[in-house]
Amino acid sequence: MLRVESVSKDYKEFKLRDISFDVKKEEHFIILGPSGAGKTVLLEIIAGIIEPDEGRIILNGVDVTSYPPEKRNLAYIPQDYALFPHMTVYDNIAFGLKLRRISRQEIDRKVKEISKVLGIEHLLHRKPRTLSGGEKQRVAIARALVIEPELLLLDEPFANLDVQTKSRFMTEMKVWRKELGFTSLHVTHSFEEAISLGDRVGVMLRGRLVQVGDVKEVFSNPVDEGVARFLGFENIIEGVAKGNILEANGVKITLPISVEGKVRIGVRPEDIILSTEPVKTSARNEFRAEVIGIEELGPLVRVNLKIGGITLKAFITRSSLIELGISEGREVYVSFKTSAIKVF
């Protein structure tokens, strides 16, 4: 469907380096990365807004690298939606169809049809300035999909929405995909969007696409320490391994594999279990630890822990914190499964 081959670009403060990946028909492919990684520049190269210094963009077997945007049959929704403020919702949605010189009757049919699917029939007479963020997003998606593009490009599509609206949109996006069968390339910094919507994900760091794969596989098996840190492995521990035992600052940790020499391991905070008594679980690593700090994070709490010469971070709910009576200075038991450990 879409194939990006060895694309590189120096553009302002961004540098893309040898980007290659493919998007399959009717797939929702996520490019996931922090701000400044070059995600938007990559989208604009695919859309034809920016020319690559090197590499090719292949769409349905055709090299479109030199094609202008209007010849690529793509639809691009930027982060600010780019609705025409002087036009009604109806005319915004109809804009691309009019450029294609479609009959007035066919335009009317298509606009009303897509408006019904996206639930915006009642907004067709209004101007963008009177719409909420969620309504503007629906109009932008309708305008993009009504032309039946080969590929829909989405730049941080939920960044301007409140939490509840974003949650509703992600649920509805799955329904729209099933009903309309479109193919999409979606860039975001949000893990939630990647996990909820992505069929596959590519992790982009510092202008390079460093890992591509199934969403679950990428999140559970980051290819290196840099990807692991970005994906939430906050606990990175360095030590010396002998067989399946790692010794780090006097603390011995059982590993999932046998290795030798100096290595680093990563453990997610959410994979660490806290208790006030020793627990009988399948966890093969259990330690006594001192609580050295507590940070409020909305519904979750980050508990900072000291085990001998190493520190760990664990996530628990606020209710669990209260129930366990955990407070700074208290001693608790820390445990985690060997399967939760990623060895680098």
Swiss-Prot record:
**Single GO cellular component term:** plasma membrane
What is the membrane topology noted in the UniProt record heading this document?
Peripheral membrane protein
> Is Translocase a UniProt keyword of this protein?
yes
Domain Mop per the UniProt entry, residue ranges: 280-344
Residues noted as binding ATP in the record, renumbered to the chain: G33, P34, S35, G36, A37, G38, K39, T40
**UniProt enzyme class:** translocase
EC number, UniProt record: 7.3.2.6
PROSITE patterns, per database record: ABC_TRANSPORTER_1, ABC_TRANSPORTER_2, MOP
Question: Could you tell me which InterPro entries the record lists for this protein?
Answer: AAA+_ATPase, ABC_SmlMolc_Importer, ABC_transporter-like_ATP-bd, ABC_transporter-like_CS, Mo/tungstate-bd_C_term_dom, Molybdate/tungstate_ABC-ATPase, Mop_domain, P-loop_NTPase
Q: Which GO terms describe its biological process?
A: molybdate ion transport
Keyword annotations for this protein, in alphabetical order, are:
ATP-binding, Cell membrane, Membrane, Molybdenum, Nucleotide-binding, Translocase, Transport
Task: Write out the GO MF terms.
Answer: ABC-type tungstate transporter activity; ATP binding; ATP hydrolysis activity
Task: Give the reaction(s) catalysed.
Answer: tungstate(in) + ATP + H2O = tungstate(out) + ADP + phosphate + H(+)
Q: Which residues form the ABC transporter domain?
A: 2-231
Q: What is its main location?
A: membrane
CDD domains the record matches: ABC_ModC_like
Location in or out of the cell: Cell membrane
What is the recorded function of this protein according to its Swiss-Prot or TrEMBL entry?
Answer: Part of the ABC transporter complex WtpABC involved in molybdate/tungstate import. Responsible for energy coupling to the transport system.
Q: Per its UniProt record, what PANTHER family does this chain match?
A: SPERMIDINE/PUTRESCINE IMPORT ATP-BINDING PROTEIN POTA, SPERMIDINE_PUTRESCINE IMPORT ATP-BINDING PROTEIN POTA
Q: Can you state the subunit structure given in the record? A: The complex is composed of two ATP-binding proteins (WtpC), two transmembrane proteins (WtpB) and a solute-binding protein (WtpA).
Q: Which family does it belong to?
A: Belongs to the ABC transporter superfamily. Sulfate/tungstate importer (TC 3.A.1.6) family.
Its protein name is Molybdate/tungstate import ATP-binding protein WtpC
Native organism = Pyrococcus abyssi (strain GE5 / Orsay)
